[in-house]
């Protein structure tokens, strides 16, 4: 998973899958809507997003952020994405 400089992913959640992330390069901000606020993810940091948890990756730096993402759970496909409209 790559987030280019100055870009962000949509605020989203999944009903059936979890995602395990390892930051391999760059620094990202993880926004967990309404619960834990924003967490800064540095290289080699690990994070788990659980089913039903709103989340958004933001790259506020001048360098790309690269994340190794492992999806696991009952259903791991692109249909299992619910996006929040801002």
Task: Identify the residue ranges that each predicted region occupies.
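A short glycine-rich, His/Asp/Glu-containing loop-to-beta-strand
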Residues: 1-18, 70
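A structural signal for the main folded, soluble domain(s) of proteins
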Residues: 3-4, 27, 35, 56
């Amino acid at each position: 998973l790559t987030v280019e400089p100055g870009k962000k992913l949509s605020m989203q959640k999944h009903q059936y899958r979890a995602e395990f992330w390892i930051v391999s390069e760059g620094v990202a901000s993880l926004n967990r809507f309404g619960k834990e606020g924003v967490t800064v993810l540095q290289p080699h940091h690990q994070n788990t997003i659980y089913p039903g948890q709103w989340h958004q990756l933001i790259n506020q730096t001048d360098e790309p952020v690269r994340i190794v993402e492992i999806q696991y759970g009952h259903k791991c496909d692109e249909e299992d994405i619910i996006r929040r409209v801002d």
